[in-house]
A protein has these predicted regions:
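Outer membrane beta-barrel strand-and-loop segments of large Gram-negative receptors
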Residues: 6, 10-55, 116, 144-148
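Membrane-embedded beta-strands that build the outer-membrane beta-barrel scaffold
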Residues: 1-11, 45-53, 61-69, 157-163, ...
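Conserved small-residue
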Residues: 35-38, 52-151, 270
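Extracytoplasmic gating/loop element in the C-terminal half of outer-membrane beta-barrel translocons
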Residues: 177-263
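Flexible, solvent-exposed coil segments and beta strand-coil junctions
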Residues: 21-32, 44, 134-142, 212-226, ...
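Short sequence motifs at beta-strands and strand-loop junctions characteristic
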Residues: 37-43, 149-154, 221, 227-236, ...
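Outer-membrane beta-barrel and related beta-rich outer-membrane complex signature
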Residues: 17-21, 61, 69-89, 179-207, ...
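C-terminal beta-signal and terminal closure region of outer-membrane beta-barrel proteins
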Residues: 34-42, 87-113, 119-124, 198-200, ...
Length: 303
């Protein structure tokens, strides 16, 4: 038929994840031991749809779409039920000794663990002003909070299209995601003019300096502010191709196809950094090499 597809629901339980756990006194040479104890649950819905809206003698159009809704969280990390137990991971450029993310039961892997930024009445961040969440009169590690945001997308998808008219053909492929968050570490490390002035780089301010207006030295806590946490949902047009096939050239019985293509055509996103697709698993953007856009001209000959 002209329409076909499938839908699958999945539930995957991963057990025996490695973690260091505290051992009883005298039972081991150290006070912790690496053991298989953690568990993680991954569930979601996958679907794909292919349909042919146009099919005539001269015209053919085929469209494909696939997507996955997913939810991942830890269900066990150690041998106790302590609700505040967490494994801290992932360092950033600035700050000393503090890690940006946590693995914690009930949360997705690499959930961001940040300070909450304070803003003025115009919505601009106030430098070194963070919310005293534990109400102890000072800003300390107890004021950081689990943001419930992670680099793991809630939904990711792909789309393809193929269109032909007589000897012409056109097609594209794209993909994207929604609900994935990136910590803009480059922005965090370059958010104040104080750094650039001291480095002798006055003409080369990061764009964020103009946006924040920060002029003093950042506090150790400011580097971990949730103001640098950004929704990195995106759509990327991976490639576009246009071709023409010559079925007969004079007395020659072969065929020849000429095609022009572009890869990494464009990206649609609200993320302010260079690229919303961050290599690795932790979603921390310390400034990556840009992906090149490639143009190609292809010639295929069949004898």
């Amino acid at each position: 038929g002209r329409i076909n597809g499938s839908v699958d629901w999945y539930l995957r339980q991963t057990d025996d994840l490695l973690n260091n756990v505290i051992t009883p006194m005298g039972s081991n040479f150290g006070n912790t031991v690496l053991t298989n104890i953690g568990s993680m649950e991954n569930k979601g819905v996958e679907f794909n749809l292919n349909f042919i809206p146009v099919q005539t003698k001269d015209w053919n159009l085929t469209v494909g779409f696939n997507g996955t809704f997913q939810h991942t969280e830890f269900t066990k990390l150690n041998n106790t039920d302590a609700p505040d137990y967490a494994i801290q991971v992932s360092s950033i450029t600035k700050g000393t000794g503090n890690l940006l993310q946590r693995h914690m039961v009930g949360y997705a892997p690499y959930t961001y663990y940040c300070f909450q930024q304070v803003y003025d009445q115009d919505g601009k961040p106030i430098q070194n002003a963070l919310v005293d969440r534990n109400k102890n009169g000072q800003i300390d590690q107890g004021d950081r909070y689990m943001t419930d945001k992670s680099p793991n997308p809630d939904f990711f998808y792909g789309i393809s299209l193929k269109l032909s008219y007589k000897n012409w053909d056109f097609g594209f492929n794209g993909h994207g995601s929604a609900g994935n968050w990136v910590f803009n570490d480059f922005a965090s490390a370059n958010s104040t003019s104080n750094i650039d002035i001291n480095a002798g780089n006055l003409p080369n301010f990061a764009r964020l300096v103009k946006k924040t207006g920060f002029t003093k030295a950042n506090s150790g806590e400011q580097w971990y502010s949730d103001m640098f946490l950004e929704n990195a949902s995106f759509f990327r047009m991976d490639d576009i191709n246009l071709g023409y096939t010559f079925n007969k050239i004079g007395n020659w019985k072969g065929s020849m196809r000429v095609a022009f293509g572009v890869q990494n055509v464009f990206v649609i996103t609200d993320y302010s950094g260079g690229d919303p697709e961050i290599p690795g698993v932790n979603g921390i953007d310390g400034s990556i090499w840009p992906r090149p856009r490639t143009y190609s001209l292809r010639l295929n000959v069949n004898f």
